[in-house]
Amino acid sequence: MNMSMGTNTERWLFVGFMIAFAVKAPMFPVHTWLPDAAENTTPGGAVMMVAIMDKIGTFGMFRFCLSLFPKAADWATPVIIVLAVISIIYGALAALAQENMMRLVAYTSVSHFGFIVLGLFALTPTSVAGANLYMFNHGISTAALFLLVGYLIKRRGSTQISDFGGVQKVAPILAGFLLIAGLSSLSLPGLAPFISEFGVIAGTWTKYPWAAGISAIAMVLAGLYIMRMYKRTMTGLPSPTVKEKVSELSMAERWIIIPLLALLIVFGVYPTPLTSVLNPDAEQTVSFVEKATGPNNATSEPTTITQGGAH
Protein backbone atom coordinates (compact mmCIF):
# COMPACT_ATOMS: atom_id res chain seq x y z
CA MET A 1 0.00 0.00 0.00
CA ASN A 2 1.44 3.36 -1.04
CA MET A 3 0.83 6.11 1.51
CA SER A 4 2.48 9.48 1.89
CA MET A 5 2.51 11.19 5.28
CA GLY A 6 4.78 13.27 7.42
CA THR A 7 7.03 11.72 10.04
CA ASN A 8 5.08 13.07 13.01
CA THR A 9 1.76 12.03 11.48
CA GLU A 10 3.01 8.50 10.86
CA ARG A 11 4.36 8.22 14.38
CA TRP A 12 1.17 9.45 16.02
CA LEU A 13 -0.94 7.09 13.93
CA PHE A 14 1.39 4.21 14.76
CA VAL A 15 1.19 4.95 18.48
CA GLY A 16 -2.61 5.06 18.34
CA PHE A 17 -2.88 1.77 16.46
CA MET A 18 -0.21 0.14 18.61
CA ILE A 19 -1.87 1.06 21.91
CA ALA A 20 -5.23 -0.21 20.68
CA PHE A 21 -3.78 -3.52 19.52
CA ALA A 22 -1.65 -3.87 22.68
CA VAL A 23 -4.77 -3.58 24.83
CA LYS A 24 -6.52 -6.16 22.68
CA ALA A 25 -3.59 -8.59 22.68
CA PRO A 26 -3.05 -7.94 25.71
CA MET A 27 0.49 -6.77 26.37
CA PHE A 28 2.17 -5.25 29.41
CA PRO A 29 1.36 -2.65 30.77
CA VAL A 30 -2.18 -2.61 29.30
CA HIS A 31 -2.90 -6.25 30.13
CA THR A 32 -4.70 -5.84 33.44
CA TRP A 33 -8.19 -6.54 32.12
CA LEU A 34 -7.41 -10.12 31.01
CA PRO A 35 -6.95 -11.98 34.34
CA ASP A 36 -10.12 -10.45 35.78
CA ALA A 37 -12.08 -11.19 32.61
CA ALA A 38 -10.83 -14.79 32.48
CA GLU A 39 -11.67 -15.33 36.14
CA ASN A 40 -15.22 -14.06 35.74
CA THR A 41 -16.22 -15.72 32.49
CA THR A 42 -17.04 -19.30 31.55
CA PRO A 43 -14.30 -21.57 30.20
CA GLY A 44 -15.95 -21.40 26.79
CA GLY A 45 -15.95 -17.62 26.98
CA ALA A 46 -12.28 -17.67 27.99
CA VAL A 47 -11.46 -19.84 24.97
CA MET A 48 -13.18 -17.39 22.63
CA MET A 49 -11.57 -14.40 24.32
CA VAL A 50 -7.96 -15.59 24.70
CA ALA A 51 -7.51 -18.32 22.12
CA ILE A 52 -9.32 -16.59 19.27
CA MET A 53 -10.34 -12.95 19.69
CA ASP A 54 -7.14 -11.71 21.33
CA LYS A 55 -5.22 -12.70 18.20
CA ILE A 56 -6.84 -9.67 16.57
CA GLY A 57 -4.40 -7.59 18.60
CA THR A 58 -1.21 -9.28 17.48
CA PHE A 59 -2.45 -9.81 13.92
CA GLY A 60 -3.30 -6.10 13.80
CA MET A 61 0.26 -5.25 14.81
CA PHE A 62 1.55 -7.44 11.99
CA ARG A 63 -0.87 -6.36 9.29
CA PHE A 64 -1.36 -2.68 10.15
CA CYS A 65 1.44 -1.37 12.39
CA LEU A 66 4.26 -2.90 10.37
CA SER A 67 2.71 -2.60 6.92
CA LEU A 68 1.16 0.87 7.14
CA PHE A 69 3.74 2.60 9.32
CA PRO A 70 7.11 0.90 8.71
CA LYS A 71 9.28 3.91 9.58
CA ALA A 72 7.36 4.59 12.78
CA ALA A 73 7.55 0.90 13.66
CA ASP A 74 11.33 1.01 13.24
CA TRP A 75 11.45 4.18 15.37
CA ALA A 76 9.41 2.58 18.18
CA THR A 77 11.01 -0.85 18.06
CA PRO A 78 13.48 -0.39 20.99
CA VAL A 79 10.67 0.53 23.38
CA ILE A 80 8.38 -2.24 22.12
CA ILE A 81 11.13 -4.85 22.45
CA VAL A 82 11.67 -3.85 26.09
CA LEU A 83 7.92 -3.97 26.82
CA ALA A 84 7.64 -7.37 25.11
CA VAL A 85 10.44 -8.80 27.26
CA ILE A 86 8.83 -7.36 30.40
CA SER A 87 5.51 -8.90 29.34
CA ILE A 88 7.15 -12.31 28.87
CA ILE A 89 8.84 -12.38 32.27
CA TYR A 90 6.09 -10.59 34.20
CA GLY A 91 3.38 -12.90 32.83
CA ALA A 92 5.38 -15.98 33.75
CA LEU A 93 6.14 -14.74 37.28
CA ALA A 94 2.53 -13.70 37.83
CA ALA A 95 1.32 -17.12 36.66
CA LEU A 96 3.70 -18.75 39.12
CA ALA A 97 2.10 -16.81 41.99
CA GLN A 98 -1.53 -17.68 41.18
CA GLU A 99 -3.81 -19.92 43.22
CA ASN A 100 -6.77 -19.42 40.87
CA MET A 101 -6.44 -21.70 37.84
CA MET A 102 -8.29 -19.40 35.44
CA ARG A 103 -6.07 -16.46 36.37
CA LEU A 104 -2.99 -18.68 36.04
CA VAL A 105 -3.85 -19.61 32.46
CA ALA A 106 -4.66 -15.97 31.69
CA TYR A 107 -1.24 -14.82 32.90
CA THR A 108 0.45 -17.49 30.81
CA SER A 109 -1.17 -15.82 27.82
CA VAL A 110 0.28 -12.44 28.82
CA SER A 111 3.69 -14.09 28.66
CA HIS A 112 2.94 -15.84 25.37
CA PHE A 113 1.68 -12.65 23.74
CA GLY A 114 4.94 -11.02 24.79
CA PHE A 115 6.76 -13.65 22.73
CA ILE A 116 4.55 -12.89 19.74
CA VAL A 117 5.18 -9.14 19.96
CA LEU A 118 8.91 -9.74 20.44
CA GLY A 119 9.03 -11.85 17.30
CA LEU A 120 7.07 -9.34 15.24
CA PHE A 121 9.22 -6.34 16.16
CA ALA A 122 12.56 -8.13 16.09
CA LEU A 123 11.83 -7.98 12.36
CA THR A 124 13.81 -10.91 11.05
CA PRO A 125 12.17 -13.45 8.74
CA THR A 126 12.59 -16.18 11.34
CA SER A 127 11.20 -14.18 14.25
CA VAL A 128 8.20 -12.85 12.30
CA ALA A 129 7.35 -16.28 10.91
CA GLY A 130 7.72 -17.70 14.42
CA ALA A 131 5.41 -15.02 15.81
CA ASN A 132 2.76 -15.71 13.18
CA LEU A 133 2.99 -19.44 13.84
CA TYR A 134 2.83 -18.69 17.58
CA MET A 135 -0.59 -17.07 17.11
CA PHE A 136 -1.98 -20.29 15.66
CA ASN A 137 -0.28 -22.64 18.10
CA HIS A 138 -1.15 -20.55 21.14
CA GLY A 139 -4.80 -20.61 20.12
CA ILE A 140 -4.88 -24.40 20.09
CA SER A 141 -2.81 -24.86 23.25
CA THR A 142 -4.70 -22.29 25.30
CA ALA A 143 -8.08 -23.53 24.10
CA ALA A 144 -7.23 -27.04 25.32
CA LEU A 145 -5.86 -25.75 28.63
CA PHE A 146 -8.84 -23.50 29.36
CA LEU A 147 -11.35 -26.22 28.47
CA LEU A 148 -9.67 -28.83 30.68
CA VAL A 149 -9.36 -26.41 33.58
CA GLY A 150 -13.01 -25.57 33.02
CA TYR A 151 -13.99 -29.24 33.23
CA LEU A 152 -12.15 -29.47 36.55
CA ILE A 153 -13.83 -26.36 37.93
CA LYS A 154 -17.25 -27.55 36.80
CA ARG A 155 -16.82 -30.83 38.65
CA ARG A 156 -15.23 -29.54 41.84
CA GLY A 157 -17.05 -26.22 42.03
CA SER A 158 -13.85 -24.31 42.78
CA THR A 159 -11.15 -22.46 40.86
CA GLN A 160 -8.57 -22.77 43.65
CA ILE A 161 -5.62 -25.08 43.12
CA SER A 162 -5.60 -25.95 46.82
CA ASP A 163 -9.08 -27.49 46.54
CA PHE A 164 -7.82 -30.25 44.26
CA GLY A 165 -5.23 -33.02 44.51
CA GLY A 166 -5.15 -36.65 43.47
CA VAL A 167 -7.33 -36.12 40.40
CA GLN A 168 -5.25 -38.53 38.31
CA LYS A 169 -6.42 -41.38 40.56
CA VAL A 170 -10.12 -40.70 39.93
CA ALA A 171 -9.92 -39.26 36.39
CA PRO A 172 -6.73 -40.50 34.69
CA ILE A 173 -7.79 -39.53 31.16
CA LEU A 174 -8.56 -35.97 32.24
CA ALA A 175 -5.19 -35.83 34.01
CA GLY A 176 -3.38 -37.17 30.95
CA PHE A 177 -5.05 -34.67 28.64
CA LEU A 178 -4.21 -31.83 31.03
CA LEU A 179 -0.58 -32.96 31.09
CA ILE A 180 -0.32 -32.79 27.28
CA ALA A 181 -2.00 -29.38 27.17
CA GLY A 182 0.26 -28.13 29.95
CA LEU A 183 3.41 -29.42 28.28
CA SER A 184 2.39 -27.68 25.06
CA SER A 185 1.95 -24.43 26.99
CA LEU A 186 5.53 -24.67 28.26
CA SER A 187 6.69 -25.36 24.68
CA LEU A 188 7.96 -28.91 25.10
CA PRO A 189 9.87 -30.11 22.01
CA GLY A 190 7.66 -32.32 19.88
CA LEU A 191 4.56 -30.20 20.47
CA ALA A 192 3.54 -27.36 18.16
CA PRO A 193 4.29 -24.32 20.37
CA PHE A 194 7.96 -25.31 20.67
CA ILE A 195 8.64 -24.62 17.00
CA SER A 196 7.09 -21.16 17.10
CA GLU A 197 8.76 -20.17 20.37
CA PHE A 198 12.11 -21.45 19.15
CA GLY A 199 11.64 -19.46 15.94
CA VAL A 200 10.95 -16.27 17.87
CA ILE A 201 13.98 -16.70 20.14
CA ALA A 202 16.34 -17.80 17.34
CA GLY A 203 15.23 -14.99 15.05
CA THR A 204 15.44 -12.38 17.79
CA TRP A 205 18.93 -13.53 18.77
CA THR A 206 20.40 -12.29 15.48
CA LYS A 207 19.41 -8.67 16.24
CA TYR A 208 18.65 -8.47 19.96
CA PRO A 209 20.58 -11.24 21.74
CA TRP A 210 19.94 -9.69 25.16
CA ALA A 211 16.16 -9.85 24.58
CA ALA A 212 16.33 -13.44 23.35
CA GLY A 213 18.46 -14.46 26.32
CA ILE A 214 16.17 -12.89 28.92
CA SER A 215 13.09 -14.30 27.20
CA ALA A 216 14.53 -17.80 27.33
CA ILE A 217 14.25 -17.59 31.12
CA ALA A 218 10.48 -17.66 30.67
CA MET A 219 10.76 -21.20 29.30
CA VAL A 220 12.13 -22.28 32.68
CA LEU A 221 9.44 -20.33 34.53
CA ALA A 222 6.78 -21.94 32.32
CA GLY A 223 7.96 -25.35 33.43
CA LEU A 224 7.63 -24.24 37.04
CA TYR A 225 4.12 -22.81 36.89
CA ILE A 226 2.67 -25.58 34.72
CA MET A 227 4.18 -28.48 36.63
CA ARG A 228 3.39 -26.81 39.96
CA MET A 229 -0.27 -26.61 38.98
CA TYR A 230 -0.25 -30.17 37.67
CA LYS A 231 1.46 -31.59 40.75
CA ARG A 232 -0.89 -29.86 43.18
CA THR A 233 -4.09 -30.72 41.31
CA MET A 234 -3.37 -34.12 39.79
CA THR A 235 -0.96 -35.99 42.07
CA GLY A 236 -1.17 -37.20 45.66
CA LEU A 237 -4.15 -38.76 47.39
CA PRO A 238 -7.60 -37.45 46.47
CA SER A 239 -9.62 -35.85 49.24
CA PRO A 240 -13.12 -37.20 49.98
CA THR A 241 -14.58 -34.18 48.16
CA VAL A 242 -12.47 -34.83 45.06
CA LYS A 243 -13.47 -38.51 45.10
CA GLU A 244 -17.12 -37.54 45.34
CA LYS A 245 -17.28 -34.68 42.84
CA VAL A 246 -14.55 -35.18 40.24
CA SER A 247 -15.43 -37.69 37.54
CA GLU A 248 -13.79 -38.82 34.33
CA LEU A 249 -14.32 -36.93 31.08
CA SER A 250 -17.48 -37.84 29.22
CA MET A 251 -17.23 -39.06 25.63
CA ALA A 252 -18.51 -35.70 24.37
CA GLU A 253 -15.83 -33.86 26.36
CA ARG A 254 -13.14 -36.22 25.09
CA TRP A 255 -14.09 -35.60 21.48
CA ILE A 256 -13.85 -31.86 22.04
CA ILE A 257 -10.31 -32.13 23.44
CA ILE A 258 -8.85 -34.92 21.28
CA PRO A 259 -8.74 -32.88 18.01
CA LEU A 260 -6.94 -30.03 19.79
CA LEU A 261 -4.33 -32.35 21.29
CA ALA A 262 -3.93 -34.12 17.95
CA LEU A 263 -3.19 -30.80 16.22
CA LEU A 264 -0.59 -29.96 18.87
CA ILE A 265 1.17 -33.26 18.24
CA VAL A 266 0.86 -33.30 14.43
CA PHE A 267 2.07 -29.73 13.91
CA GLY A 268 4.77 -30.28 16.51
CA VAL A 269 6.21 -33.08 14.40
CA TYR A 270 5.28 -31.80 10.93
CA PRO A 271 4.71 -28.02 10.79
CA THR A 272 5.36 -27.70 7.05
CA PRO A 273 1.69 -27.14 6.06
CA LEU A 274 1.68 -24.05 8.29
CA THR A 275 5.20 -22.77 7.69
CA SER A 276 4.85 -23.03 3.91
CA VAL A 277 2.01 -20.52 4.13
CA LEU A 278 3.43 -18.23 6.83
CA ASN A 279 7.09 -17.99 5.79
CA PRO A 280 6.60 -16.09 2.50
CA ASP A 281 4.34 -13.52 4.16
CA ALA A 282 6.90 -12.99 6.93
CA GLU A 283 9.73 -12.53 4.43
CA GLN A 284 7.64 -10.11 2.37
CA THR A 285 6.77 -7.99 5.41
CA VAL A 286 10.36 -7.85 6.68
CA SER A 287 11.60 -6.93 3.20
CA PHE A 288 8.99 -4.17 2.92
CA VAL A 289 9.95 -2.63 6.27
CA GLU A 290 13.66 -2.83 5.47
CA LYS A 291 13.17 -1.08 2.12
CA ALA A 292 11.07 1.62 3.76
CA THR A 293 13.56 2.27 6.57
CA GLY A 294 16.76 2.13 4.53
CA PRO A 295 19.65 -0.27 3.92
CA ASN A 296 21.16 0.05 7.39
CA ASN A 297 18.51 -2.24 8.83
CA ALA A 298 18.74 -4.91 6.17
CA THR A 299 19.32 -8.44 7.37
CA SER A 300 21.13 -11.18 5.53
CA GLU A 301 19.15 -13.87 7.30
CA PRO A 302 18.08 -16.18 4.44
CA THR A 303 15.22 -18.31 5.70
CA THR A 304 12.64 -18.67 8.41
CA ILE A 305 11.13 -21.77 9.95
CA THR A 306 11.18 -25.24 8.45
CA GLN A 307 10.25 -28.68 9.64
CA GLY A 308 13.59 -29.00 11.38
CA GLY A 309 13.38 -25.66 13.17
CA ALA A 310 14.66 -22.18 12.45
CA HIS A 311 17.51 -21.58 10.01
Question: Can you annotate each of these PLM segments?
Answer:
Residues 1-232:
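Hydrophobic transmembrane alpha-helices and their helix-loop junctions in integral membrane proteins
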Residues 41, 171-174, 226-311:
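Cytoplasmic/organellar membrane-interface segments at the starts of transmembrane helices
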